Amino acid sequence: MANQPSAEELKKKLSEMQFYVTQDRGTEPPFTGRLLHNKRDGVYHCLVCDTPLFHSHTKYDSGCGWPSFYQPVSEEAIRYIDDFSHGMQRVEIRCGNCDAHLGHVFPDGPQPTGERYCVNSASLAFSDEKNGDQLKG
């Protein structure tokens, strides 16, 4: 993993919610994320280290309250960890570069993968394909 900024540096760089989600494995409230309804073409990056994670063409409305994707940009982009917290068995997803918490992946997504990457907006930054504008979750 890449060198990650210290917790003190990240607290200065990130909002309270962004720090909670990416560093403390938190979850933003459903239907509140800034990137949930984003429909522009572009790439979703890790908010902490700017690693590309998902293309907009793999985003879909799952109705779960968080941005959902059916496939990451590459296998290396995401790190998978078994998560047995809160009395559930899930698979946590983290940035493959800096280890920031992103959300979870579930086996109930659309084809072609059948997977739903349920991602906190607060862990993402979006780069617009047409004009290069950046939007942070």
UniProtKB/Swiss-Prot annotation:
UniProt keywords, alphabetically: Metal-binding, Oxidoreductase, Zinc
Keyword hit for S-adenosyl-L-methionine: no
Cofactor: Zn(2+)
Domain MsrB: 7-129
Binding site residues for Zn(2+): C46, C49, C95, C98
InterPro entries found in the cross-reference section: Met_Sox_Rdtase_MsrB, Met_Sox_Rdtase_MsrB_dom, Mss4-like_sf
Keyword presence, tRNA processing: no
EC number: 1.8.4.12
Pfam families linked: SelR (PF01641)
Residues at the active site: C118
Recorded GO CC terms: cytoplasm
NCBIfam families according to UniProt: peptide-methionine (R)-S-oxide reductase MsrB
HAMAP family with a match to the protein in the record: MsrB
Family stated for the protein in its record: Belongs to the MsrB Met sulfoxide reductase family.
Protein name (database record): Peptide methionine sulfoxide reductase MsrB
Upper lineage: Bacteria, Pseudomonadati, Pseudomonadota, Gammaproteobacteria, Enterobacterales
